[in-house]
Structures are given as structure tokens and as C-alpha cells.
Amino acid sequence: MSTRNPRLLTLSLAIIATVAACKKTGDAPTAAAPAEPQAKPLTLDEGKLPKASVFSATDLDPGKAACGDFNEYVNGKWMAANPIPGDRSSWGVSEILGERSLAIQRQLAEQAAADKNATGVEKIIGDFWATGMDEAKIEAQGIAPIQPQLAAIDGLNDTAAIAGYIRKQAAIGDNPIFDFDAEADFKQSSMNIAYASQGGLGLPDKTYYSDADKRDVLDAYRAHIAKVLELTGTAAADAAEQAKTVIAFETRLAKASLSEEDLRDVSLYYNPVSLAQADKQTPNFSWSEFFKSQDVAAPQMFSLPMPAFHQEVSKMLGDTDPAAWRSYLRFHAVDGAAPYLSDKFVQENFNFYSRTLYGQKEIKQRWKRVLGTLNGEAGEAMGQLYVKVAFPADSKARMETLVGNLRTALKGRIENLPWMSDETKKKAIAKWETFTPKIGYPDKWRDWSGLA
């Protein structure tokens, strides 16, 4: 929605009037410029949305003893009438609300894609949706979208080239070997620092590579790796051998990784080091070069947690055959892109990760997958459209008033607590003042104009 400046409007009218008065009587009137085409307003068809799940006393099962099995007494009839859908691994009220939200988003995306006059965020959403839903083009392209990346991997013949590839992929958010992000400094929360933590495994955690009771999953993963490589054109026998290589490669990473139990200890994520100290720990991987490639200033300090993992990666850069690195990197490049490639890649990705690992019976419909990706990459852009139809400004204003009243009441209670000292009250009020309500959506949206 645009707003007009009254002073600017008045000035414009005055200029128009002056120009008109100065015209010669015989001047022909100038044709008005055609109005710019406007995007259509977004609408919502409630009739196409899933019905909300509403509690009814008839849902209670009098045939079940509430004191014996309260869950069956309250939820048994509902669960019997609402089996888990084939494209889900769980089902409940939150999932139903999620389905409704997706249905709303679908309507918005379809409208944005169909509107040739859409601009800004609406155009971004419409283009994203149209691209993701163009199955014919996706099938025709096959693996072509990632061929340049695969060609780059095929050219990795030494330690320096492999380290350079890792740096390059990290710079575009696709680090194949470790996780890298910025978070608050554990010891000084007023500033953020970089954290480089373990990664690189295709299975959920290190136990999948060693525990006997998970051997069937490891075998299925090996078969999945071979199949993915086959789909890229690798001969079956070569794909099977490369799959063994990838498993051996990841097993070595797993042995140097912390367990899920260890990862619960937040302190293990904090290992502040200087660039010089980090480079000394990983002689085959320069952190100085890494930060340069990320287009950020060299930090005085960053956190290098799980040092044994990073040291092992450095050793592998030096002692592992580049062919093994190529097999590992090639598989993960294709596997990571598989959900967005042609159907044979999508199906193979689903068969292992969703069906084998998590028991999901059916793949989600394409429109749901496209929305899932859209929300992951540009969720705030979709949110900007979503609130126009699902949470308008007057709803936000009412909630802000409600929360404001609660804050005022809380402050009053603190000030009138008889058992709290004046000094403690001052500290409590200081903490109260730091509370920033965030309701519905931000007052200032992220600027997506650079993508338009």
C-alpha cells in the first residue's frame, strides 16, 4: 500500500494550475500518460481451506476409563477417525494447522504467479512458485543445473584444490564438510563470533557408522549412494565401489566426531582461538584463507569447537586419495540438490531419507515441497503476503494493545511488591524495560528488492 504526501500533492496541483494558466488558448490538450498497470489484490477462498480441528464433547470415549488411560479416553476416537496421512510421519492438531497454513500460502503463490503485473515481493514469490511447479522444464533439465559444480569436483587433484573447493562452496552456503555460522559469544553476549563445528556426515549421527543395531541403515545408505551416483551416469560397478569409498570416508569423520550425548554439553561448542592458533591445528586447511574467501574481515578470535574433528579433516586433506574426496564431494553435491532435480533424483532421495530413515510412506505433493523450500529460503517474503489475508494490521494492533496492557500490569505489580526491596525493584524494572514484544510480523520488513 502506498501513502501520499499532502504537501507534495498540493505543490503538484499548484504547478499543474500554473502551467495550464500559461498555455496559449489555441494549444491542443496533452494526452494523459496511461496509468501503470496495478497488481491484483490478494484474496483468500475459505472454501478451499482444510477445516479446523475443533474439540467436541462427543470425541470423549465413555467406553474408556479416564483414570486408566486418559489419552485413549480423550483422543482415542479422534485418532481412530484421523489416521496418519501417507505423506506424514506424525499427525495432530499442530499438523492440521500447518496444513491450513500451507493451503493459504498455496492460494497466495498461485495468485502471485498468475498476476503479470505483480511487483516486489509478490513477483519474487510468483516467480519462485512458477519455477518450482514447472515439472516439464525440471524433467527436461535433468542434472544439468549442477553440471558446473560436478565438473569443478572432477578437476580436484590435490590438497590445495580440495581446500579451495570447500572454501568456495562455504561462501555460497554449501559447506560440504563442516557447519559454519555466527552466534553470540558465550562469554560476551553483546558480540557475535564465528563457530565452525563438525559436519560432513550423511547419516544422523556417528553411531550409524558403528553400532550393530544400525547396520541395516548403513547398508541402505551405501545402496543409496551407489544409486545416486548411477543416476548421474556412473556405471553400476564403479558406483558401488565409490559408495564403499564414501562410507569409509564418512566413517573416518564419524570416529572423530562427538556423540549426540556429548553435543548436549553447550560448553563443547566454545573453543576460542586466533587464526594463527587455528592454522597451527589444521596445517592442511588455512583458516586465514577461509575467512578471506567468505568476504569477511579476519577475526581476532573465533570458536573452533570439536578440535579432534577439524584435525582429522586436515589429516584427510593430506593423506586421503583425491579420488576418494571426489567421490565423497560428488555424491553430496548431487544428494543435496536431489530434491530440486528431475523426478528420479527426487524419488531416490525420498526413498532413503524419508521412507527408510523416518518411515514416511508417501512423498509430499510437489506444491507442498515447493512451499517448504520457499519458506526455507524466503519465508519472510511469503510471510509478508500471508499476513495481508490471515493476520491484518488491525489484528496486530489489538494484540499489541493486549500485550501492552499486560506489560503495564506487570510493571505495576513489581512496583507494589511489599517483599521486594527498592534496589531489587530497580533491577526488575530495568529488566522489564528490555522486553521487546514481537507480535505477528515485523514493523519493518526485510528488503528483497535486490532479487526482483
Where would I find each of the regions flagged by the language model?
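Bacterial lipoprotein signal-peptidase II cleavage site
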Residues: 22-32
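Bacterial N-terminal signal peptides that target proteins for export
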Residues: 1-10
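Active-site-surrounding "flap" and adjacent substrate/cofactor-binding loops of secreted or lumenal enzymes
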Residues: 44-51, 65-137
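Contiguous, non-catalytic segments that form substrate-binding/exosite surfaces or channel walls
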Residues: 233, 254, 397-452
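Extracytoplasmic/secreted envelope proteins and their assembly/folding machinery
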Residues: 57, 64-67, 71, 75, ...
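Noncatalytic, helix-rich "gating/capping" subdomain that lines the substrate-entry/channel surface
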Residues: 111-401, 405
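Bacterial N-terminal signal peptides
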Residues: 10-18
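N-terminal low-complexity, Pro/Thr/Ser-rich intrinsically disordered segments
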Residues: 32-56
